[in-house]
A protein has these predicted regions:
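Short, hydrophobic secondary-structure boundary micro-motifs
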Residues: 7-9, 68, 96, 125-128, ...
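Short polybasic amphipathic segments
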Residues: 56, 72-91
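Contiguous beta-strand/loop segments that form the cofactor/metal-binding neighborhood of enzyme cores
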Residues: 1-75, 110-121
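Short amphipathic beta-strand/extended segments with alternating polar/hydrophobic composition
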Residues: 38-41, 65-70, 87-104
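C-terminal helix-rich "cap/oligomerization" subdomain common to oxidoreductases
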Residues: 32, 113-153
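Active-site loop of classical SDR/Rossmann-like NAD(P)-dependent oxidoreductases
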Residues: 99-112, 127
Length: 153
């Protein structure tokens, strides 16, 4: 989908952890009239494991996916990561089997590529400065949206 055209967000500190800045965020990314992208992030959940969640959901016209980010549950011990796919022509969810986890593998590949590129061992970088710039542009837009406080009633 790329970079959204706008964002609505509220980001807050947790009252019992005043030494930290914003650790709870709700954001809606505007990709136009046919895409719904809502984020709910809470780094201060302290009510036990029963309803704790660290997940990503994709609900699309041609299928769906559900991802459990297990490391974020009981960090740093964590739980197993899971990926479930509901295919376009499917009638039930299918569990994707894989080895490893998203962390630290998600960072190892990018960082080792950067190190190999700097030594001349890789011809190109897997990621770009432009991508990082667009990510930070989105983060800053979330801060601005939160400061503006939304549409007044």
């Amino acid at each position: 989908l790329g970079t959204p055209k706008a964002v609505w967000a509220q980001t807050l500190a947790y009252p019992a952890s005043t030494e930290f800045a914003q650790t709870r965020t709700t954001a809606i990314l505007n990709y136009g009239p046919s895409v719904r992208c809502a984020l709910s992030i809470n780094h201060n959940y302290s009510k036990g494991p029963r309803h704790q969640a660290a997940e990503i959901r994709f609900d699309c016209e041609k299928g769906a996916a559900w991802v459990k980010l297990g490391l974020l549950l009981d960090y740093p011990k964590g739980e197993a990561d899971e990926v479930w796919i509901y295919p376009k022509a499917g009638s039930d969810w299918e569990k994707a089997e894989f080895a490893g986890g998203w962390f630290p593998e998600a960072f190892i590949g990018t960082m080792s590529n950067l190190q190999r590129f700097s030594k001349g061992e890789d011809d190109s970088l897997l990621t770009s400065v432009e991508d990082a710039f667009q990510t930070m542009k989105l983060v800053e837009a979330c801060y601005r949206s939160s400061e503006e406080g939304g549409t007044l009633l």
